[in-house]
């Protein structure tokens, strides 16, 4: 932006004239903050000079913090919620690391539901400790192109290049990622993503404008694309009376010949559905995203 260019020019001129004085360290903080978005490496160099020239100054301490932020390690991994053939990819956003490590860990989805956690996000410290205490089913390491410019980079990593997909049984798993091989949390970035290895896809078709309070959807075999008849669909609803508010297992139905299911809806109550079916001799499960349907009175 032009205002930033003018400020940058003014700050650079001030630093050139007053570089010997510790007040220039404050100018370097301001200049580094402007440069940070466009050129993190240059911003780091500007801030480091303040630290070296005037280490005891207020500006140098602020520059030290800025350098630490620019040098901070970043790792975020996103992937499809359901894994099936063709296997998806891991979408990796990273900075200041040259590799990361993965573990595939069995997830107790029913335990999470009973604790009132029907989703894979919102991992707290207790969850993280529990996940890291479980043995891994498989492990892998991904080498990344370096980010010498201190910018975030994105890389797509095929799941099949990391894990032996042919030996992964259907079920729920945590994909645990760490830039440290020992997965310890000190000086580390550890994340966990819940995935379902399953051929089942549950498609929500609930009409939220309808006056009929019911949840509807279809269950499809991802491999063949055909509807699954006889799949078991169980509703779990949020218990408003318990603290913390747990999910409670309630009624079950089966899909018809078109793969369709219908279950009653309790107005305003958060509901998820566990869908199960035997396919080629193996039981497959999948958990839907939470739904909430409000009853509409006839007008």
Across the structure, where does each feature detected by a protein language model lie?
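N-terminal, cleavable Sec-dependent signal peptides of secreted/periplasmic/extracellular proteins
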Residues: 1-299
């Amino acid at each position: 932006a032009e205002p930033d260019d003018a400020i940058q020019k003014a700050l650079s001129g001030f630093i050139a004239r007053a570089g010997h004085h510790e007040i220039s360290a404050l100018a370097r903080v301001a200049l580094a903050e402007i440069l940070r978005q466009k050129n993190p490496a240059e911003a780091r160099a500007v801030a480091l000079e303040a630290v070296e020239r005037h280490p005891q100054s207020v500006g140098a301490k602020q520059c030290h913090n800025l350098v630490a932020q620019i040098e901070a390690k970043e790792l975020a991994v996103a992937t499809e919620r359901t894994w099936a053939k063709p296997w998806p990819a891991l979408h990796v956003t990273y900075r200041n690391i040259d590799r990361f490590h993965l573990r595939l860990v069995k997830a107790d989805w029913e335990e999470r539901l009973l604790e009132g956690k029907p989703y894979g996000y919102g991992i707290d410290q207790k969850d993280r400790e529990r996940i890291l205490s479980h043995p891994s089913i498989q492990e892998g390491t991904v080498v990344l192109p370096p980010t010498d410019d201190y910018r975030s980079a994105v890389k797509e990593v095929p799941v099949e290049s990391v894990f032996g997909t042919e030996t992964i049984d259907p079920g729920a798993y945590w994909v645990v990622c760490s830039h440290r091989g020992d997965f310890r949390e000190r000086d580390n970035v550890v994340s966990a993503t819940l995935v379902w290895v399953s051929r089942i896809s549950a498609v929500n078709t609930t009409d939220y404008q309808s006056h009929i309070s019911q949840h509807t959807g279809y269950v499809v075999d991802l491999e063949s694309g055909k509807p699954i008849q006889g799949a078991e669909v169980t509703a779990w609803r949020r218990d408003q009376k318990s603290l913390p508010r747990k999910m409670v297992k309630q009624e079950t139905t089966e899909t018809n010949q078109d793969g369709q299911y219908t279950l009653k809806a309790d107005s305003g109550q958060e509901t998820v559905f566990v869908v199960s079916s035997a396919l080629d001799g193996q039981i497959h499960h999948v958990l839907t995203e939470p739904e909430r349907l409000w009853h509409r009175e006839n007008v």
